Curated annotation (Swiss-Prot), chains A, B:
Domain CMP/dCMP-type deaminase residue range list: 1-122
The protein's name in its UniProt record: Riboflavin biosynthesis protein RibD
Ligand binding (NADP(+)): A154, W170, T196, D200, S236, G303, P304, S305, L306, S307, S308, S309
Presence of keyword Kinase: no
Keywords: Hydrolase, Metal-binding, Multifunctional enzyme, NADP, Oxidoreductase, Riboflavin biosynthesis, Zinc
UniProt-annotated binding residues for substrate: S168, R184, L204, R207, E301
Cofactor note (record): Binds 1 zinc ion.
MF GO annotations: 5-amino-6-(5-phosphoribosylamino)uracil reductase activity; diaminohydroxyphosphoribosylaminopyrimidine deaminase activity; NADP binding; zinc ion binding
InterPro entries hit by this protein: APOBEC/CMP_deaminase_Zn-bd (IPR016192), CMP_dCMP_dom (IPR002125), Cytidine_deaminase-like (IPR016193), DHFR-like_dom_sf (IPR024072), Eubact_RibD (IPR004794), RibD_C (IPR011549), RibDG_C (IPR002734), Riboflavin_Biosynth_HTPR (IPR050765)
Domain of life: Bacteria
EC number of the protein: 3.5.4.26, 1.1.1.193
Recorded name of the encoding gene: ribD
NCBIfam families recorded: eubact_ribD, ribD_Cterm
Organism: Buchnera aphidicola subsp. Baizongia pistaciae (strain Bp)
Protein family per UniProt: In the N-terminal section; belongs to the cytidine and deoxycytidylate deaminase family. In the C-terminal section; belongs to the HTP reductase family.
Length: 372, 372
């Protein structure tokens, strides 16, 4: 019970890094000596100290004989920082409680082995689900090579995204559209299509989220920590030009193409050629490539064609649908273009995860039918 | 503050009649003498005593000099029961607090006038909104001549009601379908179409709701109180025959037609001829006719054609949509057949009133955009 109590606190601490640690996971650490919390820390940003180091430094002498509660297995290899396992022994920690092992198959279990070898008592699995939940993208990328993929949509209650004449501004309310900024800021990359750019000419950046109380708290240590997601535009026909708003907007942008062109592109634009036999951009290749760029969380913001292509591949982990209390009718544009199913058992299934009212609209979060 | 406190109790009592009082409204009454509740009552069923009479009888002598809290203006005319106003004075009540006036324009205000004339102090308007809310159908029928109209639908998250081949069994889960029984039992009439009867051959009755705890409580005084809603089938082409399941099933059923036929119908079937110049059944005429049958609450359970016709008339007070976490795609059948709108400002708008999860599905209750 005590272990759960302190691990909950460590997870709460870990969440403070939710907007800033990626590609690293969120990690929190609490050091407890004789039922007194003597130190705590959390990981802020890649290249900065790990949670354990902050916690040990605040504990000082009091770490001797204490228990460390860590939301993720401590590292035992020299990366950008010296290994946390060494620090834990150096400070005299006698027991380590770990929520879950490191999912990186190259290092998973090594920290535990190291600690045990150095006479430290190790408990594994306390609130493991919760710890994995706050690092879904990191865990999925490490274990499958594919980032966590969210698909964002906005529709009427009868599942329509635009009128027959294309008008869709605006089906949902200001508040719902502002909420999208918060979904974006939790993403490492936003995938969109050249169709969306040609039609809407969006910036695809995170804007005006600093006035949010929670973000103020998360970012108060340094506003510069909030990073813009990488914008990824699928442009197989080279239709995007240097004059589009998203191109002029600073911030890394990947143009995913089959062939490069001879335009002069700003330095923050990177043409990535994804060619294969089919002469089409393979979306699985794309998300695997993004995983290699250490992208944990992808947000898809596109029209029904690209959204449907991802849906058919069965790689959407989360659907985020903003629903306005309007009815657009049968002439309006559908949410998805799918096949003509013969049986209800064949259709894509999800499960409702979280329902909130955002202003006049509903925000539905659904997860893959079989994902936990 | 005390008035609100006691009126809340009276409204809670009134709700006990929610499945049984129609066509009468739900009414509760609390009698308070010197800060002590000395009597209480609620209306159970048309023809039975009014709430005030029960409350006065339980108070007896203690009603003298007491305050009566009544959720609706007491009657002053001799109807099926002697007027409550007379009883209130006879028992020596000195003050009456009324949530709201009787909406029936023929009698509204008469009770208050009578009480004042007999030296009783009258306060009007305590929790009036709450009192109207528990009698929405009654108030709307009395003030507009049109019952409260609910439209029930079931769809996928992309707003589809069936696959292209017509398969719709079942999009939603058992639990959601069972919940529909509770929606039916709160209705005085269910409107459906001959299309639905020919395709699904449903009974359109309330079934298996007595195992519900709340209903057990509501009905414990007498199970016979739960009445079946009147089934109303729009059958302009005389396609329903005596062999359909809903016809064989006992319980009043109105066949709404343009011409009668020569079939021999069971005595619980009533052919109602609604003819007009257009040779079509006018849905406004239909609901006004049902209001004359003292129908307070109508539930529409039909396919997209009839549902859309009601929607276009702008007389739907409440939309009840069960949404399954499935995606049926663009080939599947739409929720509504409407016009090809040119502007988003022209589309039907509602507002989300209540969202609940029923098993795997969502139940959305929406109300008319401008209704309170």
């Amino acid at each position: 019970m005590k272990d759960i109590f302190y691990m909950k606190k460590a997870i709460k601490l870990a969440k403070k890094g939710s907007l800033t640690t990626s590609p690293n996971p969120n990690v929190g650490c609490i050091i407890v000596n004789n039922n007194i919390i003597v130190g705590s820390g959390w990981h802020k940003k890649t290249g900065m100290k790990h949670a354990e180091i902050y916690a040990l430094k605040t504990s000082g002498e009091k770490a001797k004989g204490a228990t460390a509660y860590i939301t993720l297995e401590p590292c035992s290899h020299f990366g950008k920082t010296p290994p946390c396992c060494v620090a834990l022994t150096k400070y005299g920690i006698s027991r380590v409680v770990i929520a879950t092992l490191d999912p990186n198959p190259k290092v998973s279990g090594n920290g535990v082995k190291w600690l045990k070898k150095h006479g430290i008592l190790v408990t594994i699995g306390t609130l493991s689900k919760e710890s994995i939940k706050i690092n879904k993208g990191f865990f999925q990328r490490m274990t499958t090579g594919i980032p966590w993929i969210k698909l964002k949509l906005a529709s009427s209650i009868d599942g329509r995204t635009a009128l027959n004449n294309g008008k869709s501004k605006w089906i949902t309310s200001d508040k719902a559209r502002h909420d999208v900024q918060h979904v974006r800021e939790k993403s490492d990359a936003i995938i969109s299509s050249s169709e969306t750019i040609l039609f809407d000419n969006p910036l695809l950046t995170v804007r005006n989220t600093n006035n949010n109380d929670n973000n103020q708290k998360l970012l108060k240590h340094s506003k510069t920590f909030l990073k813009q997601p990488i914008r990824v535009i699928i442009d197989s026909k080279n239709r995007i030009t240097p004059s589009h708003k998203c191109i002029k907007q600073p911030g890394l942008l990947f143009l995913i193409r089959i062939h490069s062109d001879n335009n002069i592109w700003p330095s923050h634009i990177k043409q990535i050629i994804l060619n294969n036999k089919s002469k089409k951009i393979d979306l699985i290749d794309l998300v695997k490539m993004l995983a290699k760029y250490q992208i944990n969380n992808i947000l898809i913001e596109a029209g029904p064609s690209l959204s449907s292509s991802f849906l058919k591949l069965n790689i959407i982990n989360e659907l985020i649908i903003y629903i306005a209390p309007k009815i657009l009718g049968n002439y309006a544009k559908p949410l998805f273009f799918l096949e003509n199913y013969s049986n209800l058992s064949d259709v894509p299934q999800f499960k409702f995860e979280k329902i909130t009212q955002i202003g006049k609209d509903l925000k539905l979060i659904l997860t893959k039918h079989n994902s936990s």
